[in-house]
């Protein structure tokens, strides 16, 4: 039930944000995503803080796999302060089949998937030619993630991504790095492993 509520909050907020785009320039997704290359495990390098990830303190990953119905399964995992892992399973469908760079994602239960508001925009707005990193955003600029195939990213690449994101209307000052390779110890203090 908790996963449903968190997923519902994400979808509802993303739906509201699409109405509040105002004077932002039109957001463009990358021209093409090869889904076979996009599948697999991604490490969250950084993000805009959001309510549905507030329990996460590090080791956040997203793993994509192909489903038989042509959609993608999304498994998000993160480490919580108490040392346990939290997992949320979602589904993604391709919103733009010519480019594969615009997805609709839901974490709500399948029996309400017919409701449009449970599907949130999830656009690939920057992508390394070798698929070593991907940047995700949505037209309202309320959500933003930097993902990579490795748990660490060199600072030069990270800064270049932030500069490109800023030119698209995202705010680098809101971006928060995600710790990877951490564990919890007594008192909720984090250590790198």
Where are these regions (language model features)?
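Positively charged n-region of N-terminal signal peptides that target proteins for export
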Residues: 1-4
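A beta-rich soluble binding module of mature secreted/lumenal proteins
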Residues: 7, 16-193
